[in-house]
């Protein structure tokens, strides 16, 4: 209960150390640190750290050319008082730890030792995000910042299991000849934890997987398992030809599709001693042939600090026409994947020729299911969205069905980019939907090549598409542009993005990574040299202004219809650079498709960065003459001056372009004779007719391809810096409670001067679920023409959920490290949000331990409770009636246990069924927790003098951003845990609160108080234990706080002392007064009494005398 | 083309031949040195075949520098020279001579009994700082190359006038010869260069660096050591074929590389096979001239230092020397002998470094810094105990580039910092401005160090803060690193004041006018001891009360336990009430006060110090201060608590000790804050108090007095009861009658007497009663 508090305070302490945002895409920051957990860190390696139960020890050194220089740099920094600092962050947490300064004669490395508790308190197994670590010199300055990861090995679910028999790598390599494909699935929260599965042919059978905890960087971080026996044990009969088909690792389960069925693991969070067991999901009527063609679909999302609305869904589709006996060829299930239901709602069943379901994905942000259908007969694909109601898709589609054009003839699948709301449909084209499947836009067209696999990195937003032919294309999430990056030559391979977004190529027996070891340089390309994205045709340049140029792509007249696309500019060229074979380059700004002029079916508008090289006279002799242009039907005839003998048209001049300033350009298509050539105009409207251009007033460009293509298209270097304030992480998760709001700020900085300024937004924002939160964006250009965007999100409805927000720098090059930032906003209660009671007198922690904290009067403010203490009840001090023990020790006698009722009540909680206090295992946190759940552990409570009047009950809310006092509308109810009375609360009730109170009180059936200015008065004695609860409906959080007050030095419950004292005083005073009055009045009771006595005596004696006389007389 | 030469030739128009008087000094026949005064630009000393001393930057023809014959030097060979403030120290013939150039006077320094060859020292150019004067005054004199175990090292704290023998800790155990001894103020350490078997290393005097030597380096030849100005801890060690460099006052010494563009050609001078003739150093620049007639230039940055070669030009001669005129302007100086005149002319060649670096063949990158400044440059700061300092610097990079600013301190063992770098607006041409906030406090309070990394918190130290750009190009000639001097020590503006809210004057007990009028008071001989030992003196002491100094005394009622309220003031503003430990001493030696606690009741774990022992130990009163105070609660203090009943004489701090007065009158107290962790300052003052309300000394014991009073009361009660009763008896009546008669008679007598008195009027009236009362007894 108390542990979150400590966690929060650690967190808060660290938050304030960050002062400025980090600028991404700056290319010149050198990565200089090499760090490791154990031993001497290796140079040029990605920093991979692992957190175990013990302290996290990290050694770092500064990488330079050689070892001596790196020692020298360490000493220079140390003697300058500089040591690096380590930032540990994930989407909700960031902490800063400093490497200590050490005399460099003592040590040649920097070392830091962080107790595990300072990073995380929990040790339970759960889906936890892998941390990002950033080591920088000079904390805060982001100098030599080097990134790495930190994995909590103790909590990562899959790492706690052995899913089969461990086998050595040598045995795995025996399989290689029989492997037909590889499958990788990674842990949604920690991408460095991944499973590699082998799909084997029918000769060998079995399920073989490798589990890595270090992102396949090294051989030693992968363990190989033979799961064949584990799978077979689930099958009643002996089957043959077992092979892996597909697998998905969700947050808490492992789902494996094999040729013999679909197997679902037990919950990975609760490991037992035996190895991982699976259960088989039954699909009636499906057999091996179907399973082999099956596919699993999963929307990858990390559910760290999971909330009730966060559930994993997995879909399985089979490539088979539905027969009458089968309900569907697509099934989906939610955690724990025991019940698989058909994807299609019942109503669809009636339709006769219904298209097959290629993919069904659950959009968790909007609570919908997205279908990708394919009609094999008509070869058309459609997308449809249905709202999920009670986990069943509604038969009515949410939006009108989206029909893809017929060019999207072979769709393969659909995938959500992890942790975001970008939906990609792929096949022979790539389509992107940013609105959850309502509409799609075309990103890429591959015509007859088909994209078979996609790979995603949530961290860098990078996406890689691999086609049937082994071509590799890459883009960034949400971007409208993409580029070709090369091709894969291996037959059997798969790709994999690790947690830091480094792409790995996994082939049989060989893992290649794109990151270092090439040290400080750029990352290595896994797919050969960056390919030229040009195509085989000639270009005709046309200047439109000084720095703007249009390139027309020439399509020869005789080009067959099917291959026309290969002579046209396409989407891929958008945002690329055209390089000339000579000099010059231009950035492509726009791609245009058109039907006129004839011969030019596409063009690009480009921004000239460097002028293009012209043809010289020695290359084209025609330039030494003037030029006459005549229209000849659709084409133009170019004629040279016959007087100039040396000026001739030659064969090499074909596909060169005549450029006339102020007029249309002409692409020479054929040479008629030495002096005449035919050409086509780029802009027939502005083409000159029957005009002569003198020598040197016309120019010739060569963008032809006849003698080898003279132009090339490559990716553009990164052109924007991206700055994100307030947070060091790109994938933050922010919680927005009811009535709260959050502001996000980002900035786009152009990184070079003389860049063309755009008036249109540089940044587009998409909201995953616009209905959840009120999101408004405000954009401005600042003094340096940087583009600043401020997004504010406020809670809107009493509905919990999460939505992703995406910032896309749409005009950034795909070469940029960051083009997209995807923060997640949750309309929910943050796990860091809690309510706290501020004690009226602060007592330092050391004093709590010692148990003595005296105020100025020497009154000890800490009461150490007696062992097995129970607070008194209304029936009397000695008759406790509560179930709660304090300072429990089962080995000691229980005091105040005389009465039957007291004996009946009182139950140990933490100490139940143990014999001594030690066995209760009370932690320090539990001992100092106010929570009633830990009352057994509680030893010391704050002590106050009787009576308590006007004790201020001040409460505050602690969240990520700091502390705020609790005030309306957070009204509270207050109860005494041990059902004691004799206390009273006083609070101010303004008019608005009065109404709220009247509204809420009948519903709750309890008194509701205004938390500001709440005062407590206690008339009783001994321990009071209060619980304050914030009423529901004002926050998503369950805000409860408890506090204790021990009232001491109370007077006796029976006012005997006072009564006796008063009575005595009254009696004494009365006596004195009477005596005085008697004296005054001259009454002397003593004398009277004496006299009376004397008289009596006399009387008596007389009587006796007479009697005596009488008696004697009678005797006589 | 490096530069164009010009010749300085002045004063030679008239045929006036000046004579060279005295012994002509010389340095070395083949090499030269040029020593510039670190603080005064135009003062320099040229050492070569001749020695020249200039006060105008060699802008006049000069006669060779001589030493008066009266100084009687044997061989006038100068081996070392050093500017200490306005003094020029020269080692001539193994003795140290002082030339005061302001007064043009020579003297010989005192105290040196053994031959020395070198003097070393540093200069601090922050004028008006007491600390800086101290820096300039500290000079070492030593014999270079002598075996350390038996050599004699001298130091002076008077700027070289008088020297004392310097005791280096365990000097006799150090094996090797002495390469030099220096006071590195940047590190607050004295460091000795130990040369042993071709390796040199620095040995430091104080914790935490005294445990081991600095890293060793190759020591070839006899290295000259130059401390770059600015107290940044930059050292240059050089010889003909060796040029070494240290950032951190010798802890790590590295070779200077020879580069071309980004490429390192040679990793040391030795590899480059060049022979250095002369070098010049400023705070961040380095120029080297070689025998091969090449000029090299480098800057002293954070990254390993390097030099680049400029185009060749014939400039070298045996007499040539280099000096920096200003940042980026190098002067090549050659003295020219004049056959007709004894005064030498000077050939000067001014090199504009910035212009030379523009040469594309040098492949020097463009400077990425547009602007770098901080408001703290050329200022000195003080950080006292627990105080903090915030400095800011601003930085503008060239558009589209990013800089790596590094903040460093020269002495991280005592000064720690945290820096933050952030965007802070834009310039008018749209360039982004950056700001660097540096937050400094004592390293011991950051908690980011190993326990043995920090120096003693008690000791005052100093450190230099430098802000430099790590990825600075050599072309950034005009962009100097920002640096400032920070003294972790006493803030001289601090003082203590005793709160005087209730003074004897304001309560009307004493009259300020009387006090100001040469007021004096007497301390009776029983109450004071001039020796502060608590012995009674033989005669009373007349003390003059200095109202000027003490003001009106604080009023203290005798019966209360008292301790002063000590306030800390900085300049004229109140800071806080001091809660640290302090001690009081009555300046006249009065001992009629005591302390409320004893060593035991103050919970001492060891024997506390007291005035008696302190006076004995330090030979006088008023020497108890933060330097010598040892707390009796200190767990490291191992003096056993032998006398637990002695008075605990330390007030303040964690104990509730107070003073008990036993006697009325004036007390003048000396107060000294002894807590070493309160401030680096020696906080002390004198104040006076006036104690009143004490009874005069009792002669009879209280019991007797009480008994007497009670018995007299009882007696009178008995009389009051008995008299009326007695009067009723016959005897009583007689007495009554007798008394009435007596009364009547008295009356007459009285009347008579009264009239008589009226006549005489001399007799005191008090006398009347006695006979009257006496007679009434009858």
From Swiss-Prot, chain A:
Keywords, ordered alphabetically: Cell membrane, Cell projection, Cilium, Developmental protein, Differentiation, Disulfide bond, Flagellum, Glycoprotein, Membrane, Spermatogenesis, Transmembrane, Transmembrane helix
Cytoplasmic side: 1077-1116
Species the sequence originates in: Homo sapiens
Name of this protein: Cation channel sperm-associated auxiliary subunit beta
Any one Gene Ontology cellular component term annotated for this protein: cilium
Protein role: Auxiliary component of the CatSper complex, a complex involved in sperm cell hyperactivation. Sperm cell hyperactivation is needed for sperm motility which is essential late in the preparation of sperm for fertilization.
Transmembrane regions listed in the UniProt entry: 1054-1076
Subunit structure: Component of the CatSper complex or CatSpermasome composed of the core pore-forming members CATSPER1, CATSPER2, CATSPER3 and CATSPER4 as well as auxiliary members CATSPERB, CATSPERG, CATSPERD, CATSPERE, CATSPERZ, C2CD6/CATSPERT, TMEM249, TMEM262 and EFCAB9. HSPA1 may be an additional auxiliary complex member. The core complex members CATSPER1, CATSPER2, CATSPER3 and CATSPER4 form a heterotetrameric channel.
One of the GO BP terms on file: cell differentiation
Signal peptide residue numbers: none
Coiled-coil ranges from the UniProt annotation: none
Disulfide bonds: 35-60, 189-302, 330-343, 718-816, 829-1037, 911-920, 922-937
Lineage: Eukaryota, Metazoa, Chordata, Craniata, Vertebrata
Highest taxon, organism lineage: Eukaryota
Residues bearing glycans: 90, 100, 118, 226, 321, 618, 690, 913, 921, 1010, 1015
Listed Pfam families: CATSPERB_1st, CATSPERB_2nd, CATSPERB_C, CATSPERB_head, CATSPERB_Ig-like
Subcellular location: Cell projection, Cilium, Flagellum membrane
Claim: Glycoprotein is one of the keywords in the record: yes
Membrane topology: Single-pass membrane protein
Regions of this protein lying in the Extracellular compartment: 1-1053
Principal cellular location given in the protein's record: membrane
């Amino acid at each position: 209960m108390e542990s979150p508090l400590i966690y929060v305070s650690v967190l808060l302490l660290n938050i304030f150390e960050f002062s400025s945002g980090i600028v991404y895409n700056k290319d010149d920051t050198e990565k200089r640190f090499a760090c490791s957990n154990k031993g001497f860190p290796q140079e040029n390696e990605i920093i991979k750290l692992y957190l175990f139960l013990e302290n996290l020890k990290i050694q770092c050194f500064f990488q330079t050319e050689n070892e001596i220089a790196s020692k020298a740099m360490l000493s220079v920094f140390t003697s300058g008082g500089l040591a690096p600092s380590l930032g540990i962050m994930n989407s909700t947490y960031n902490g800063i730890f400093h490497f200590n300064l050490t005399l460099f004669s003592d040590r040649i490395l920097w070392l830091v030792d962080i107790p595990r508790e300072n990073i995380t308190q929990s040790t339970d197994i759960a889906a936890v995000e892998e941390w990002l670590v950033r080591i920088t010199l000079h904390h805060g300055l982001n100098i030599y910042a080097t990134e790495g990861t930190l994995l909590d090995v103790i909590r990562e679910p899959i790492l706690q299991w052995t899913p089969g028999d461990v086998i050595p790598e040598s045995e795995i390599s025996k399989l290689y000849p029989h492997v037909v494909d590889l499958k990788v699935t990674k842990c949604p929260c920690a991408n460095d934890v991944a499973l590699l599965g082998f799909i084997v042919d029918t000769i060998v059978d079995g399920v073989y997987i490798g589990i890595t905890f270090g992102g396949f960087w090294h051989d030693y971080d992968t363990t190989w398992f033979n799961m064949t026996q584990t799978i077979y044990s689930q099958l009643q009969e002996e089957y043959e030809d077992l092979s892996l088909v597909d697998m998905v690792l969700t947050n808490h389960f492992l789902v494996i599709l094999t040729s013999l069925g679909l197997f679902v693991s037990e919950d990975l969070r609760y490991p037992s001693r035996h190895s991982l067991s699976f259960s088989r999901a039954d699909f009636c009527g499906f057999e091996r042939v179907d399973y082999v063609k099956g596919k699993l679909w999963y929307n990858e999302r990390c559910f760290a600090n999971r909330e009730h609305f966060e559930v994993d869904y997995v879909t399985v589709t089979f490539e088979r026409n539905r027969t009458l006996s089968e309900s569907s060829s697509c099934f989906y299930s939610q955690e724990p994947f025991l019940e698989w239901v058909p994807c299609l709602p019942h109503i669809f069943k009636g339709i006769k020729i219904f298209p097959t379901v290629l993919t069904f994905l659950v959009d968790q942000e909007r609570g919908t299911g997205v279908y990708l259908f394919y009609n094999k007969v008509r070869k058309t694909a459609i997308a449809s969205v249905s709202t999920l109601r009670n986990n069943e898709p509604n038969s009515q589609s949410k939006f009108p069905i989206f029909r893809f054009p017929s060019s999207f003839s072979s769709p393969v699948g659909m995938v959500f980019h992890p942790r975001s709301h970008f939906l990609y449909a792929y096949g022979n084209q790539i389509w992107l939907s940013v609105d959850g499947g309502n509409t799609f836009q075309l990103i890429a067209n591959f015509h007859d090549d088909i994209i078979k696999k996609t790979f995603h990195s949530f961290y860098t937003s990078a996406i890689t598409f691999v086609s049937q032919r082994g071509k590799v294309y890459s883009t960034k999430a949400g971007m409208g542009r993409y580029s070709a990056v090369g091709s894969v030559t291996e037959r059997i391979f798969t790709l994999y993005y690790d947690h830091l977004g480094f792409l790995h190529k996994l082939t049989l027996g060989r893992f290649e990574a794109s990151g270092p070891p090439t040290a400080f340089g750029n990352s290595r390309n896994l797919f050969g040299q960056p390919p030229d994205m040009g195509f085989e045709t000639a270009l005709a340049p046309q200047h439109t202004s000084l720095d703007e140029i249009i390139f027309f792509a020439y399509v020869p007249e005789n080009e067959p219809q099917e291959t026309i696309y290969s002579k046209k500019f396409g989407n891929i060229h958008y945002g690329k650079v055209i390089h000339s074979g000579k000099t010059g380059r231009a950035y492509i700004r726009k791609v245009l498709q058109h039907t006129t002029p004839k011969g030019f079916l596409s063009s690009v508008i480009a921004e000239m960065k460097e002028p293009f090289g012209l043809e010289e006279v020695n290359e084209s002799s025609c330039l030494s003459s003037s030029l006459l242009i005549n229209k000849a039907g659709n084409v133009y005839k170019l004629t040279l001056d016959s007087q100039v003998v040396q000026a001739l048209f030659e064969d090499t001049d074909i596909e060169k372009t005549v450029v006339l300033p102020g007029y249309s350009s002409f692409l020479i298509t054929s040479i008629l004779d030495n002096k005449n050539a035919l050409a086509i105009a780029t802009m027939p409207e502005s083409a000159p007719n029957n005009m002569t251009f003198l020598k040197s007033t016309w120019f010739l460009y060569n963008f032809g391809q006849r003698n080898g293509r003279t132009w090339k298209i490559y990716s553009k270097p990164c052109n924007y810096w991206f700055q994100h304030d307030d947070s060091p992480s790109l994938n933050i998760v922010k919680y927005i409670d009811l009535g709260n709001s959050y502001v996000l700020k980002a900035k786009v900085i152009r990184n070079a001067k003389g860049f063309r300024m755009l008036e249109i937004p540089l940044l587009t924002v998409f909201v995953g679920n616009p209905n959840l939160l009120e999101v408004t964006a405000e954009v401005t250009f600042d003094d340096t023409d940087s583009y600043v965007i401020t997004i504010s999100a406020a809670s809107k409805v009493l509905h919990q959920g999460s939505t992703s927000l995406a910032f896309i720098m749409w005009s950034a090059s795909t070469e940029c490290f960051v083009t997209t930032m995807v923060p997640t906003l949750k309309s929910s209660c943050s796990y860091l949000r809690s309510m706290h009671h501020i004690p009226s007198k602060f007592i330092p922690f050391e004093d709590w331990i010692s148990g003595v904290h005296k105020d100025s009067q020497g009154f000890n403010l800490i009461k150490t409770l007696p062992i097995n203490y129970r607070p008194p009840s209304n029936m009397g001090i000695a008759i406790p009636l509560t179930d709660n023990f304090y300072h429990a020790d089962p080995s000691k006698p229980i005091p105040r246990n005389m009465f039957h009722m007291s004996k009946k009540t009182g139950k140990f909680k933490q100490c139940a069924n143990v014999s001594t206090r030690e066995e209760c295992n009370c932690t320090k946190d539990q001992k100092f927790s106010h929570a009633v759940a830990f009352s057994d552990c509680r030893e010391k409570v704050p002590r106050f003098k009787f009576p308590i009047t006007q004790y201020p009950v001040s409460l505050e809310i602690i969240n990520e951003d700091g502390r705020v006092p609790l005030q309306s509308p957070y009204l509270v109810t207050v109860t005494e845990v041990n059902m004691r009375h004799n206390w009273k609360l006083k609070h101010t009730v303004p008019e608005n609160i009065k109404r709220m109170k009247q509204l809420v009180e009948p519903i709750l059936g309890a008194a509701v108080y205004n938390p500001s200015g709440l005062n407590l008065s206690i008339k009783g004695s001994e321990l009071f234990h209060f619980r304050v609860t914030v009423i529901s409906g004002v926050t998503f959080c369950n805000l409860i706080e408890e506090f204790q007050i021990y009232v001491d030095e109370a007077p006796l419950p029976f006012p005997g002392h006072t009564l006796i004292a008063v009575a005595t005083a009254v009696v004494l005073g009365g006596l004195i007064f009477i005596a005085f009055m008697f004296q005054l009045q001259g009454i002397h009771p003593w004398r009277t009494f004496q006299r009376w006595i004397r008289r009596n005596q006399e009387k008596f004696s007389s009587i006796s005398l007479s009697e005596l006389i009488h008696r004697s007389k009678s005797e006589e | 083309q490096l530069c164009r030469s010009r010749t300085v030739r002045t004063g030679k128009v008239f045929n006036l031949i000046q004579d060279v008087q005295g012994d002509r000094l010389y340095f070395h026949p083949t090499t030269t040195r040029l020593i510039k005064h670190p603080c005064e630009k135009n003062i320099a000393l040229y050492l070569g075949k001749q020695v020249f001393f200039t006060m105008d930057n060699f802008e006049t023809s000069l006669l060779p520098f001589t030493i008066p014959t009266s100084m009687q030097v044997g061989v006038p060979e100068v081996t070392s020279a050093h500017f200490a403030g306005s003094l020029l120290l020269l080692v001539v013939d193994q003795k140290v001579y002082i030339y005061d150039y302001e007064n043009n006077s020579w003297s010989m320094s005192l105290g040196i009994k053994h031959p020395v060859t070198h003097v070393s020292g540093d200069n601090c150019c922050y004028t008006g700082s007491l600390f800086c004067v101290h820096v300039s005054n500290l000079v070492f004199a030593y014999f270079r190359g002598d075996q350390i175990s038996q050599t004699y090292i001298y130091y002076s704290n008077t700027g070289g006038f008088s020297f004392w023998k310097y005791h280096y800790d365990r000097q006799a155990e150090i094996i090797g010869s002495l390469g030099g001894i220096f006071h590195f103020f940047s590190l607050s350490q004295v460091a000795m260069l130990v040369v042993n078997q071709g390796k040199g290393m620095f040995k430091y005097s104080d914790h935490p660096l005294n445990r081991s030597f600095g890293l060793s380096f190759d020591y070839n030849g006899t290295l000259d050591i130059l401390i770059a100005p600015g107290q940044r801890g930059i050292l240059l060690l050089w010889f003909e074929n060796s040029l070494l460099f240290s950032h951190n006052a010798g802890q790590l010494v590295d070779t200077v590389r020879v580069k071309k563009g980004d490429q390192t050609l040679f990793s040391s001078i030795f590899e480059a096979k060049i022979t250095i003739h002369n070098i010049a150093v400023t705070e961040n620049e380095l120029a080297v001239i070689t025998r091969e007639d090449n000029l090299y230039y480098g800057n002293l940055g954070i990254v390993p230092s390097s030099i680049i070669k400029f185009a060749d030009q014939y400039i070298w001669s045996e007499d040539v020397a280099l000096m920096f005129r200003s940042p980026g302007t190098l002067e090549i100086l050659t003295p020219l002998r004049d056959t007709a005149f004894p005064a030498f002319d000077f050939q000067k060649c001014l090199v504009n470094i910035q212009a030379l670096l523009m040469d594309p063949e040098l492949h020097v990158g463009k400077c990425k810094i547009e602007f770098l400044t901080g408001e703290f440059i050329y200022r000195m700061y003080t950080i006292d105990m627990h105080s903090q300092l915030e400095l800011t610097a601003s930085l503008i990079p060239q558009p589209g580039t990013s800089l790596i600013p590094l903040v460093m301190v020269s002495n991280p063992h005592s000064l720690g910092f945290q820096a933050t770098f952030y965007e802070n607006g834009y310039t008018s041409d749209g360039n982004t401005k950056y700001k660097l906030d540096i937050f400094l406090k004592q390293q011991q309070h950051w908690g980011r160090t190993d326990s043995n990394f920090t120096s003693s918190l008690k000791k005052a130290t100093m450190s230099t803060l430098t802000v430099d750009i790590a990825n600075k190009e050599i072309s950034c000639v005009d962009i100097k690193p920002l640096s400032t001097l920070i003294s972790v020590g006493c803030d001289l503006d601090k003082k203590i004041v005793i709160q005087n809210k209730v003074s004897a004057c304001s309560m009307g007990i004493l009259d300020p006018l009387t006090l100001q009028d040469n007021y004096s008071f007497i301390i009776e001989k029983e109450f004071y001891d001039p020796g502060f030992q608590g012995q009674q003196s033989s005669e009373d002491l007349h003390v003059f009360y200095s109202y000027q100094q003490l003001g009106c005394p604080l009023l203290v009622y005798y019966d209360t336990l008292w301790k002063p309220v000590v306030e800390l003031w900085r300049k004229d503003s109140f800071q806080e009430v001091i809660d640290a430990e302090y001690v009081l001493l009555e300046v006249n030696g009065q001992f009629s006060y005591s302390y409320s606690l004893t060593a035991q009741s103050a919970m001492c774990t060891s024997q506390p110090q007291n005035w008696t022992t302190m006076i004995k130990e330090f030979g006088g009163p008023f020497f108890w201060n933060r330097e010598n105070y040892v707390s009796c609660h200190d767990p490291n203090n191992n003096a056993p608590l032998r006398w637990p009943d002695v008075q605990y004489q330390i007030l303040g701090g964690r104990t509730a000790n107070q003073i008990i007065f036993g006697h009325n009158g004036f007390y003048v107290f000396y107060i000294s804050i002894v807590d070493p962790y309160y401030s680096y300052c020696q906080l002390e003052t004198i104040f006076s108090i006036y104690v009143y309300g004490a009874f005069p000394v009792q002669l009879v014991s209280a019991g007797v007095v009480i008994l007497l009073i009670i018995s007299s009361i009882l007696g009178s009660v008995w009389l009051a009861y008995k008299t009326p009763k007695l009067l009723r008896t016959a005897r009583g009546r007689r007495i009554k009658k007798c008394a009435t008669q007596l009364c009547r008679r008295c009356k007459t007598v009285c009347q008579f007497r009264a009239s008589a008195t009226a006549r005489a009027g001399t007799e005191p009236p008090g006398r009347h009663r006695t006979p009257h009362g006496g007679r009434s007894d009858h």
